[in-house]
Amino acid sequence: MDHNGLHGFYHWMRVLQNGRQLAKAENANIKVVELFSLLHDTQRRNENYDPEHGMRAAQFARTLRGSWFDVTDTEMELLSEALIHHSEGYTDGDVTVRVCWDADRLDLGRVGIEPKPDKLCTVSARDPNILFWANARARYKA
């Protein structure tokens, strides 16, 4: 996959910014949110349909644990859940997992899709100011 493409490095950095903002507002586990942001699309095989990329990302994260980053068992479970299900449209779950999913969804503007508040998981992500901020960055790929 092209790491400069739609699911590449710049997307990961915007998801990281979104995640940090939401994690602070929602009192989520920032370490898990940051790891999710940087890992969630690393195992994509293409820019289009790749339903197993979340599972591969979770498996990849497990191989990095202990050498590239340290997390508790609980944090690893949260990270794995967020990675595995991030493309499925779920809105329920632990606040940290929901923040991860919203951080990614707030960057849909990069592909011309404006995030719909009713498809977001957290109150903070549905805030009109956050939606505007994230969507503007996504559309202009800033």
Residue ranges and their predicted role:
Residues 15, 19, 52-68:
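An active-site-proximal "capping" alpha-helix that borders the catalytic cofactor pocket
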